[in-house]
Amino acid sequence: IGKATALHFAANHWNVIATMISLDEGKDLQNKPNIHCYLLDVTSTESIQTAKEKIVQDFKTIDALINNAGIGYRSFVELSEDTNIKSIVEVNWLGVVKVSRAFIPVFRMQNHGQIINISSIAGLVNLPLGSFYHSTKQAVESFSECMAYELIDFNISVCTVQFGNAATNFQSNVTKSPTSGIASYDALMKKVTDILHKKTAKNTDLTPKITQKLLS
């Protein structure tokens, strides 16, 4: 979604500031017209601040911020691991918090701006094995609504975008708890994984619909 959004906005003559945890990931974007790539790790306050300072130096104004970074973790609560829980919270929720917090002063001084947080239908409905992913997306929903009330006097709008399984590599990259040897758990893991992959494969037209909606 992030790459498709960057390309769509750039094609519509926006200056796109594309941030990523490794610039190697953005090699195919670096020579595209209107796209400017910056190193930024959403889990690192220092990295966010460094990127922000460079971006503000390079551009006079910033009109919109899209928080898109996200990872998945499909696990039973009993089998969950602290490191994986920490990772999904740091990326999916605290990443949104930290990046938003960094750029709010820029928008406030400009007296305009828009913060768009990519959430998910998972922020509204729940599925088994999604205890941690759904929790982070629901946190983004609540955080965004509260922040919107705080920033309205500064002409800064905040919204979330909730969509289902887009045809990206997200599902393939989801971290899953290992086979447990518990028949009920293993059967449910297979069932949920199969359903999500099938839904993802069907939604081939969802990504362009999302990018078009963001631009509007």
Q: What annotation goes with each model-predicted range?
A:
Residues 153-216:
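SDR active-site lid
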